[in-house]
């Protein structure tokens, strides 16, 4: 557990550097948040070759065939997100893992924008490292980095030498933030209370209860997302990033769009006057915004819907956007 996922990825990159030789290759995407890109790109200073898995210019999605063409017998690490924070489509991580492991490469998965919507099973996914931020799961601002036991053995300790054999300290060069870490217990309690509210008392295990809760969350969020997506795809001059229809397990309820008729920050500002909170900008996915041919200074409007939002709120959002944008 560290201060942020960005820092956790940076420390991880440094811990794996000793495995790499001049000419070895790392695959990164231009879809990810910069946290899972920049730290790996910096390793090019040591002769490591960075190969970029690029998004489609129409919708911002990644094509597995393109990854297959990038992976070689020199590939050592593949870095990708389970869900882009602006594209929203769930990437097929199990297939990414299969392709990477075929040549013995490690897989580093960013689950930050995936975590609020889906509870992962890292062993089923088969990833070597998985990271997410606890503020995305309604807790304090911390970053969690998980590594399989075999993958952790390949890391070079980044903390004090006398803690090298302690896995919880191995990739933590600083002391833990005790108060914030203690507060993380509230996340489990919150989701357990959510389960009890909808399902009552249960003899299921904590993990089983969480999965049941997140299945319900996914169904609800897809309904919310489709209210907005159905409007946006029929509105002239609107460009939607990612899929234009939400299916649980395939698309998150994080919807980013660009309006030809009005700057993104103007839309966000106008919505705030109606007490509707959305974001505008590049959301640290600047490379993705640029790849889609958009101006990073303008970026996109991002609507982040989660389980506690309601259909009435999304309907109000749609009506307000419609009143803000000129024309029909």
Q: Where in this protein do the model-derived segments appear?
A:
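Pyridoxal 5′-phosphate
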Residues: 1-328
């Amino acid at each position: 557990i560290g201060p942020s996922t960005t820092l956790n990825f940076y420390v991880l990159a440094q811990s794996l550097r000793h495995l790499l030789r001049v000419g070895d290759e790392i695959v990164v995407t231009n879809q990810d948040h910069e946290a899972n890109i920049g730290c790996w790109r910096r390793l090019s200073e040591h002769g490591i070759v960075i190969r970029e898995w690029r998004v489609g210019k129409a919708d911002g999605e990644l094509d597995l065939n393109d990854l297959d063409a990038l992976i070689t017998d020199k590939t050592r690490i593949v870095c990708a997100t389970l869900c882009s924070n602006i594209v929203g489509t769930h990437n097929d991580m199990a297939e990414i893992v299969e392709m990477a492991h075929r040549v013995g490469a490690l897989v580093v998965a960013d689950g930050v924008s995936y975590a609020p919507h889906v509870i992962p099973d890292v062993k089923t996914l088969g990833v070597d490292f998985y990271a997410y931020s606890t503020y995305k799961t309604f807790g304090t601002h911390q970053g969690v980095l998980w590594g399989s036991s075999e993958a952790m053995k390949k890391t070079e300790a980044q903390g004090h030498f006398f803690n090298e054999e302690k896995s919880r300290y191995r990739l933590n060069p600083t002391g833990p933030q005790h108060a914030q870490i203690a507060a993380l217990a509230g996340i489990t309690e919150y989701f357990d209370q959510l389960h009890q509210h909808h399902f009552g008392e249960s003899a299921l295990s904590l993990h089983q209860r969480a999965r049941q809760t997140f299945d319900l969350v996914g169904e609800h969020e897809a309904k919310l997302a489709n209210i907005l997506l159905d409007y946006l795809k029929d509105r002239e001059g609107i460009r939607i990033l990612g899929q234009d229809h939400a299916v649980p397990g395939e698309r998150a309820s994080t919807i980013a769009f660009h309006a030809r008729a009005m700057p993104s920050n103007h839309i966000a500002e106008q919505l705030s006057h109606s007490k509707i909170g959305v974001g505008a900008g590049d959301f640290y996915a600047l490379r993705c915004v640029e790849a889609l041919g958009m101006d990073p200074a303008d970026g996109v409007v991002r609507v982040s819907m989660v389980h506690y939002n309601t259909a009435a709120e999304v309907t109000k959002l749609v009506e307000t956007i419609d009143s803000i944008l000129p024309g029909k």
